[in-house]
Amino acid sequence: MPGVMIVEDDAALRELLRDALEKRKYTVITAADGREALAKFRPSVVDVVITDLLMPEEDGLMVIMKIRELKPSAKLIAISGGGMAGPGSYLLMASKLGADAVISKPFLPSELVQKVKELLS
């Protein structure tokens, strides 16, 4: 099955998303921040990266830029509570940096799983 990396500093949300994806037989790697994500990222294993945008250490925008360099074909999903309002919103910046999809918090895990499925089809 395809590999998915979840980069999220909220431990409860990270585990909720992991469970939802593993139930659909995805291989899941998790990281609590951008620095950990970049240390764990393996292009041969990870097909989709789901990253929160506001995190300590390396933020999600940096993760998007670096993953795009390491594996241009990776699908990138940005998640944030910042929403899409305004020209300076984090989700809008993520789109401009190459995120394939953006999802505003709160969302249902099933919505995210569906987006992963769509991006991989």
Language model segments and positions:
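Conserved acidic carboxylate
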Residues: E8
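Charged docking surfaces used in two-component/phosphorelay signaling
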Residues: E15-K23
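Receiver (REC) domain active-site loop signature in two-component systems and cognate sites
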Residues: M55
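Alpha4 helix (beta4-alpha4-beta5 surface) of REC/receiver domains from two-component response regulators
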Residues: M62, G83-I103, S110, Q114
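Hydrophobic/aromatic residues positioned on beta-strands within the core alpha/beta folds
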Residues: I79-G81
